[in-house]
Amino acid sequence: MAHKKAGGSTRNGRDSESKRLGVKRFGGESVLAGNIIVRQRGTKFHAGTNVGIGKDHTLFALSDGKVKFEVKGPNNRKFVSIETAE
């Protein structure tokens, strides 16, 4: 009789589900009000003009327009703003 001994168990073999963070709309892209621009943990990017921030630090468009990324301020912070077509 062919026998194969049972394989041992392991305590490894699991990982957390990816959270799909990152920039969703890049510089120059057109957005509509309510579109998510960046999903992030903490404020890696800060909200500029016409951009709102959610309780999980998600940045979203408050008006229609084009996305603009800029670095400004004494601490070289990254800001995301929306340039409206007026």
Swiss-Prot record:
NCBIfam families: L27 (TIGR00062). The lineage of its organism: Bacteria, Pseudomonadati, Pseudomonadota, Gammaproteobacteria, Vibrionales. The keyword Ribosomal protein applies. One of its GO terms (biological process) is translation. SUPFAM superfamilies: Ribosomal L27 protein-like (SSF110324). Residues 1-22 are annotated as: Disordered. GO terms for cellular component: cytosolic large ribosomal subunit. Keywords: Ribonucleoprotein, Ribosomal protein. GO terms for molecular function: structural constituent of ribosome. This is Large ribosomal subunit protein bL27. HAMAP family: Ribosomal_bL27. InterPro entries: Ribosomal_bL27 (IPR001684), Ribosomal_bL27_CS (IPR018261). Belongs to the bacterial ribosomal protein bL27 family. It holds the Pfam family Ribosomal_L27.
